[in-house]
Amino acid sequence: MSDPILNLLKFFNPETSHSLSLSLLKIAHKLHLYSLLGIKFNFKNQDSLVFKNLTFKNRLGTAAGLDKNADYIECLGALGFGFLEVGTVTPRPQIGNPRPRVFRFSKHNSVINRLGFNNKGLEHLINNLKRSEYDGVLGVNIGANKDSNEEQRIKDYLICFRGVAEYADYITINISSPNTPGLRDLHSNNNIAELLNEISLEREKLNYKNPIFLKISPDEDLNTYQNIINAVIEYNLDGLIATNTTIQRDQSSSSSITDTQGGLSGRLLYDKSNEVLKQIADHSKQNLLIIGVGGVDSRDSFYNKLKLGSSLVQVYTCLLYTSPSPRDAHESRMPSSA
């Protein structure tokens, strides 16, 4: 998308801007305007990755939340990413939390959201997956409905797992959104063991051979991360996605940031997510594949995630601030929208 259009979209509230951006991208793709408008990332000299039976054509993919309902698979896939992750999807549709629920902090290339797993539900997403002609690696991020109690919450994950298994190249279990009350309780030792045991049994029933990842919070202590790593290995999951958004705020942050509730993402998450990434990489001893996400907005920050121990990297928030361009491959930014 051209910079003038991107600048115009910034006059809308962040959630509306996000929806309009994706809609315009979809139209441009259908009309074969990507080349004319310079809408494509250049991943020149980037290496591929083979993991299990999947080939990631490059190391950069989109994070869950960008395309919650798998409505934009083709137009996002045509940008050149190595993989896409859609969702988070819940069994039943839900509208999420009241608006306004997304807040842009442009000075810091950061966003706070309290969306609350708003999505059109499992059936809608599955129908889109069935229709998709995307030939790259496609992951699906699954969650639980907000009104589900503890017992039903695990059932929600199993319902989504069964629903998407036929179509997902990998599945991500999202236990880390801060905007669904009680969801992060699944990080505790007993809860994570119960959840992953059920997921493991379901995997065997379905003979699901593709990778399963667990997406974690950046707000836990080292002991919790060690327990999670042990559980992920014990129940034969394949890796971790580090990290989701943070509810913690730096003391030096402005009052507008510290006073806004929700999950913080973008550049202000970068250091914190990197700390967790390094801890996870050090303690998993290369037994797990790690996907790094959080605050990547340059070539340097992309490669730093890889140096810290991730094999793949995801982006989302910084796509709200920049647009893909052919010049990206020749500048210090990696592509800038990373």
Predicted regions and their residues:
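Glycine/Thr-rich beta-alpha phosphate-binding loop at enzyme active sites
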Residues: 22, 28-29, 33-42, 177-191, ...
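Catalytic cores of alpha/beta
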Residues: 73, 222-231, 297-308
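Conserved, mostly hydrophobic/aromatic
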Residues: 13, 62, 84, 125, ...
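Glycine-rich beta-to-alpha transition loops that act as phosphate-gripper elements at the mouths
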Residues: 64-67, 216-221, 289-300
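A gly/proline- and charged-residue-enriched helix-loop-helix capping module
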Residues: 94-134
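Short beta-strand/loop segments at the ligand-binding rim of alpha/beta enzyme cores
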Residues: 55-61, 135-139, 206-216, 283-292
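Active-site glycine- and acidic-residue-rich loops that bind
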Residues: 146-157, 216-233
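Conserved small/polar residues in nucleotide/adenosyl-binding loops
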Residues: 321-326
